[in-house]
Amino acid sequence: MKAIAIATVNANCLVTLAASVTAYVPQDVVVFLSGSRMIFPRHRTVVMDNDTTNFGDAYNKVCKAAFEEFDEIVVCNDDIVFTPYTWQTLSEDVSKLKGENIPLGWVACRSDYARGYQNIRIGKGKMEWFRWETENQIIQTEVIAPICAYVQKDAYVDFLPLNWYSDDVQCLMMQEAGKSHFVSRAYVHHVGSQTCGFDATNLIESAKPVIKEHRPDLYDLWFRKT
């Protein structure tokens, strides 16, 4: 893991993310940053303009730039905070899964603002030092959000030009290509919804035409009333 790919629009939380990367991520990791001219203090930073209009296209652009130099990257939202253990734990989990010869899709960090088992509030078993027992396990799942997530170049599939549902569609397309997704033991704090906002109705309606055009099967499954 030698590269981080970040896309931002308003950069509201970017200073905090940069501080945590500076403190906790190895210095030989390269940061690819779209949408800001900020240079991370201790890391080589490759900056580029973000001329896109949605999450999917923004991350396709910055990931493509990172993949020109590296075969595996960590995709990060601009509103997360690393802990002292995030990078090491994620790296350990990726190495373990590679050792099991699993065709990897995403290996995603847990968070306090995510869905399903990716959310630290959703767990099973007894509590161990303020954590659910399952938080110390790598869990296979169908869909993750790449809030902070590892992916290989040969596994990556372009996001559709979406804000909402981009994760769902892309994860499914990667599964269709034979890849498996996992939730790591690693954790990042996630502020959440800093770019797209909280207007769920508008975000859903905006996604429908794109999904209908590119994946009518999913449109029928998710939106067509019976």
Regions found by a protein language model. Give the residues of each.
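A recurrent flexible, glycine/aromatic-enriched loop bordering the glycosyltransferase active site
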Residues: F130-V151
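Short beta-strand-to-loop element that shapes/binds the nucleotide-sugar donor at the catalytic cleft/hinge
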Residues: G105-I122
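C-terminal catalytic/acceptor-binding lobe
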Residues: P161-T226
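Conserved donor-nucleotide/metal-binding helix-loop-beta segment in metal-dependent transferases, i.e.
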Residues: Y85-G105
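A conserved hydrophobic helix/loop-capping motif in glycosyltransferases and polysaccharide synthases
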Residues: K2-C13, S34
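Glycine-rich, basic loop-to-helix element that forms the pyrophosphate-binding segment
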Residues: D49-A66
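Short beta-strand-to-loop acidic/aromatic patch adjacent to the donor-nucleotide binding site
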Residues: F70-V81
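Short, well-formed alpha-helical segments that are part of the catalytic scaffolds
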Residues: N10-Y24
